Design a protein with these regions (language model features):
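Membrane-cytosol interface at the C-terminal ends of transmembrane alpha helices
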Residues: 1-73, 105
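Internal/C-terminal transmembrane anchor helices
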Residues: 78-106
Length: 253
């Protein structure tokens, strides 16, 4: 951490950037930025230097360090050199902020099933707060930001299955209560491909499994039973919201 703070001072960037280097997914964007900023701090500002720094995953910095006599540019301009560079910098900043919000604060979802049709309809768009119950730290550390399990318009995975972080969740501001509507990932270990008779299975990290939205009716420690279509918790009838109550009679015209 100390080395990262010193590096931020060398490249003339704020020390709080160090935090971004340790946030999964965000760090995949920040590391290339740091490589480029380090090169420019020693006068390497050409497009070729930038390309070599990116294509070698930063090892180009080690190469020029031992093969060239470089001078540190202490008073370099931190502003982009051109309108194109300014646009790229703005886009990167927007992606970093959006990924932070998307991963740890609020995420948009689309309702995939009709099980909550009295409250939510299939195809409805909604925003889900991750702060209330505590955001889960991404387990797939190498993945494209702002997408789920596949790259749009392709059938390719948007992530690598290795390396993976263990399951970890940040502290929340409230506990899950009965009758809360919650978004979660499909909990089973493997997923069968829909409409595929070959019984092939898709193995995914927990955070890349399909998103589902359901109503919570039981919490840890509850004794749950269903009698005549009604839910009982610890022997008492669960009081559901009006739109969540079972319907036993229908009017037929």
């Amino acid at each position: 951490v100390y080395n990262a703070i010193v590096l931020m001072k060398i490249i003339g960037r704020p020390t709080w950037w160090t935090i971004l280097l340790f946030i999964p997914i965000i760090n995949l964007i920040m590391f290339p930025v740091i490589w480029i900023e380090t090169l420019r701090s020693f006068g390497k500002r050409s497009a070729l230097d930038t390309f070599l720094g990116l294509i070698t995953l930063g090892f180009y910095i080690y190469y020029i360090n031992y093969t060239q006599d470089l001078e540190y540019v202490a008073d370099r301009s931190l502003s982009p050199d051109s309108k194109t560079a300014d646009t790229i910098s703005s886009l990167l900043f927007a992606v970093v902020v959006a990924t932070l919000v998307h991963t740890y604060l609020i995420q948009p979802y689309t309702i995939p099933t009709s099980s909550l049709e009295k409250s939510l309809l299939v195809g409805d768009f909604l925003f889900v707060s991750k702060m209330n119950y505590g955001a889960r730290v991404p387990m797939a550390t190498i993945a494209l930001p702002m997408v789920h399990d596949s790259i749009p318009f392709t059938k390719s995975k948007s992530y690598l299955t290795w390396p993976q972080l263990p399951y970890m969740r940040l502290p929340g501001i409230q506990n899950i209560n009965r009758t809360d509507i919650v978004a979660f990932n499909w909990p089973v270990d493997t997923v069968y491909r829909f409409f595929d008779t070959s019984k092939r299975r898709a193995y995914k990290p927990v955070d890349k499994k399909s998103n589902y939205v359901k109503r919570c009716v039981g919490i840890p420690g509850d004794s749950l039973s269903i009698k005549d279509g009604l839910i009982y918790i610890d022997g008492k009838l669960l009081q559901l919201p009006e739109r969540a109550k079972p319907q036993f009679s229908y009017k037929v015209a």
